[in-house]
Curated annotation (Swiss-Prot):
Cited HAMAP family: MetX_acyltransf
One Pfam family named in its UniProt record: Abhydrolase_1
Organism lineage: Bacteria, Bacillati, Actinomycetota, Actinomycetes, Mycobacteriales
UniProt protein name: Homoserine O-acetyltransferase
Catalytic activity: L-homoserine + acetyl-CoA = O-acetyl-L-homoserine + CoA
Species this chain originates from: Mycobacterium leprae (strain TN)
Length: 382
C-alpha cells in the first residue's frame, strides 16, 4: 500500500469537520484511488510535542462526529457522545481526541458516492478496500496534519478491527490500544449475515449495479432491510424479548396485515439509517469487514498477534452475539501486551460497547494510563 505525499494541512477547529487531502492511495489489492479526502474532527488541544492524540475509530455506519449536537456537516448527534470532553473518559483537558470518517464512508471521506477524476461518482468503480487500507488512510491524514504518532487508538466493532490493524501494522506509531467487541478475523457467522445484507441491497432494482447516484433512484428498500437484519445482530435476544415480546404494534393486528412491535422497531432503525447513510458505502464497508483477517500475509494470526509489543486493553460484551466473548478471549490470550480479557456485563448485545458508559469508560481510562506509561518510557529512551 502506498500513498502519495501531500503538503501539511491544519487540524480543524474543535468539533468542526475538516477535510484532509492525502493524495492517491494504492490499496492492499493494488487498486489506485486518486485524490483521497479524509474527513476529520477533533476535541481538545494538541500538545506542543504532539504526543497526546487519542484516535477514536468508528464502526460500520459511524462517522467523525463522536460527540456533540447535530449541526453543519454532521446531521446527527455524536454517536459516542459520553466518550470525550472535560472530565470524560478521554479528558480533553489532557488529551486531544481525533476521529475520522473512514475511507469508503459517506460523511466527507472518499467513498463510492464521491466524484472521481472524470467528474462522475465512483459507484461500481470504487475498489474493494481492506481494514488495512482504512488505517493507512487515517495515518496519512494524521501525517498531513503533522502528527506521526498517537497516544492511543480506541475502537469497537469495525473500529476495533481498525485499532487492531493499527497496533499490528504500525506498532511504532501508537503507545496503547483499546480493542472492543472485535475478533482476529471475520467469522463464518459474520460473513453469512453480512453477505445476506449485501444481497438485500444488490437485489433491489434501484441498485443498478452500484451506479445509481445520478439516476434519481437509490436502493432504499434494500438498505433498510439490510439494516433491519444487521440491527438484530447488534442487540441481544434477551433485550429484544424483554422490550417487545410478541406484542402487537399499538392497535395493529398482524393477523390482518398489522405489525408486531419488534417489526415496527426494526423498520424505524432502517428508516433512520436511510436518512443519513449511503447504500454504496454500506456495501463497500461490509465487504471490508468480511475480508478482515489480521494474519493475512503475516504468517498467520498467531505470528501476527504474538509479535505485537503494544500494550492493549481487550474488552468484550457478555451478550454480544455478533462478536461473542470467545473472540475477545482469543485476542487477549495471544496479544503479549494484554493482561487479560475485560468483560462488560450487559444485556444490550454488541451495542453494549456504545451503551455501557461506566464500564467502557473505565476501560478507556485504563488504556490511557498505559499510554501515559508509554510516554514516560519514550522520554527515558531519548
Amino acid at each position: 500500500m502506498t500513498i502519495s505525499k501531500v503538503p501539511t494541512q491544519k487540524l480543524p477547529a474543535e468539533g468542526e469537520v475538516g477535510l484532509v487531502d492525502i493524495g492517491s492511495l494504492t490499496t492492499e489489492s493494488g487498486a489506485v484511488i486518486d485524490d483521497v479526502c479524509i474527513a476529520v474532527q477533533r476535541w481538545g488541544e494538541l500538545s506542543p510535542t504532539r504526543d497526546n492524540v487519542v484516535m477514536v475509530l468508528h464502526a460500520l455506519t459511524g462517522d467523525s462526529h463522536i460527540t456533540g449536537p447535530a449541526g453543519p456537516g454532521h446531521p446527527t448527534p455524536g454517536w459516542w457522545d459520553w466518550i470525550a470532553g472535560p472530565g470524560a473518559p478521554i479528558d480533553t483537558n489532557r488529551w486531544c481526541a481525533i476521529a475520522t470518517n473512514v475511507l469508503g464512508g459517506c460523511r466527507g471521506s472518499t467513498g463510492p458516492s464521491s466524484l472521481a477524476r472524470d467528474g462522475k461518482p465512483w459507484g461500481s468503480r470504487f475498489p474493494l478496500i481492506s481494514i488495512r487500507d482504512q488505517v493507512e488512510a487515517d495515518i496519512a491524514a494524521l501525517a498531513a496534519m503533522g502528527i506521526t504518532k498517537v497516544a492511543a487508538v480506541v475502537g469497537g466493532s469495525m473500529g476495533g478491527a481498525r485499532a487492531l490493524e493499527w497496533i499490528i501494522g504500525h506498532p511504532d506509531q501508537v503507545r496503547a490500544g483499546l480493542l472492543l467487541a472485535v475478533g482476529v478475523r471475520a467469522t463464518a457467522d459474520q460473513i453469512g449475515t453480512q453477505t445476506t445484507q449485501i444481497a438485500a441491497i444488490k437485489t433491489d432494482p434501484n441498485w443498478q449495479g452500484g451506479d445509481y447516484y445520478e439516476t434519481g433512484r437509490a436502493p432504499e428498500n434494500g438498505l433498510t432491510i439490510a439494516r433491519r437484519f444487521a440491527h438484530l445482530t447488534y442487540r441481544s435476544e434477551v433485550e429484544l424479548d424483554t422490550r417487545f415480546a410478541n406484542n402487537n404494534q399499538g392497535n395493529e393486528d398482524p393477523a390482518t396485515g398489522g405489525r408486531y412491535a419488534v417489526q415496527s422497531y426494526l423498520e424505524h432503525q432502517g428508516d433512520k439509517l436511510l436518512a443519513r447513510f449511503d447504500a454504496g458505502s454500506y456495501v463497500v464497508l461490509t465487504e471490508t469487514l468480511n475480508s478482515h483477517d489480521v494474519g493475512r500475509g503475516r504468517g498467520g494470526i498467531g505470528t501476527a498477534l504474538r509479535g505485537c509489543p503494544v500494550p492493549v486493553v481487550v474488552g468484550g460484551i457478555t451478550s454480544d452475539r455478533l462478536y461473542p466473548l470467545r473472540l475477545q478471549q482469543e485476542l487477549a490470550e495471544m496479544l503479549p501486551g494484554c493482561t487479560g480479557l475485560q468483560v462488560v456485563d450487559s444485556t444490550y448485545g454488541h451495542d453494549g460497547f456504545l451503551v455501557e458508559s461506566e464500564a467502557v469508560g473505565k476501560l478507556i481510562r485504563q488504556t490511557l494510563e498505559l499510554a501515559d506509561v508509554g510516554s514516560k518510557e519514550d522520554a527515558c529512551s531519548q
